[in-house]
Amino acid sequence: YLMEVERCIELGFRGFLVWDEGVLSLLNTMKQNRDLPEDIVFKVSIFAGHANAAGFRLLESLGAASGNPVADLTLPELASIRSVVSLPLDIHIQLWSSMGGFNRIYETPEIARVASPCYFKMEPGTGLGMYMPWGMSDDMLAELGREKIRSVKNIIELIGQVHPELKVSKQGPKDLKIPVLN
C-alpha cells in the first residue's frame, strides 16, 4: 500500500482512503517527518468500522482528515461523534444492493443539522459487478450517473427547504483534494 501511495503522489493524488488505524498512524508519521507532502490528507473508510465518538476521537488524533462512520448510525449517535471531533464526516446516504442497500435521503436535513461539517456519499452503484468493463453498458453507466446527480439535486433542495440556515459546499472545496497535475 505504501508503494501505491508514493506512486499516486507522483501522479498528483493528494487524498487517500485508509482502512486501518495502524496504516493511518504510519502515514501520518511519514507526513510529519516530511517523507510525504504536507498537503496530503487521509480519509478513513467505512470499512474501518467506526461507530462511536471515542473511535472518531482516536482517528482525529492519528491524523485523519475525515472519516466514514458505519452506515446505519442514528441521529443521536452521529451527534455524539460530532460533539468530540472537528473533522468532516463522510456519511453514506444511499447504498446499493452490493452493500446491503438503504436510502437515507429524507434524513439528510437532520443528519446535516447534527453532523456538519459532513459530506454525503452515494455509492457504489448497482453492484460491484459494474466495475467490470463487461458488466454494464456505457448507456447503463451514464444513466446511473444521471440518477446520482438527480439524488444530489434533491438532497440540496430538501436541506434548503427544511434547514435553510445550513450551507452547502460549493463545487470543488479545497478539502476534497482533487489531484494536481505535475
What do these predicted ranges mean?
Residues V70-A71:
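Short beta->alpha connector loops at strand-helix junctions that form conserved
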